[in-house]
Amino acid sequence: LRSLDMDYKTMQQLIENISESEKQLLEYTSSKDPYKIRGAVPMEEARLLAPIPYPQQDVICLGINYMDHAAESARYKKEAFTGERPFAVYFSKRVNRAVNPGEGILSHSDIVTDLDYEAEMAVIIGKEASRVPADQVKDYIFGYTVINDVSARTIQNRHKQWYFGKSMDGFLPMGPCIATVDELEFPPK
């Protein structure tokens, strides 16, 4: 970004402050051969970092977000599964620092006996939002990244809730990149 005279110190600053003309410049530049861009570094020499290493707020998640998982959850709880979920299941993850791509995670083996993980698509909200009408949702999304939702099932089962078992240090590997909202079909599938 510095080679394009954009002096954002973090991706969070870019998300909050990027102008339309800067977006156009990035779009134009990204269509070029990356090794012809001043200051470009070959991928094999780069160290990839989490796109948003220090999220400003808890990460809000949508649980049991596909049919197979809903059926699995119902079996685990010994409930009948009708194929319908009238209401979404939300939970949050406290994240002090996202884990970089390829970096190991802490096992917390002193209190955790079984780690679980699920690859998830993360939606990055680009501006303040509350009670956004469905037809305007896309306008509030900056982009998407990949996260690994790591869980300590031992802790979740013992405490009968998800927060602590999903929020231990190192339980949010993220990245390696962000796809802007316009790069994917909306809504993404």
Label every PLM stretch briefly.
Residues 1-84, 88:
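N-terminal non-catalytic cap/leader segment that marks the start of a structured domain
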Residues 52, 56-189:
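Glycine-enriched loop-and-adjacent helix/strand subsegments that border the catalytic/binding cleft
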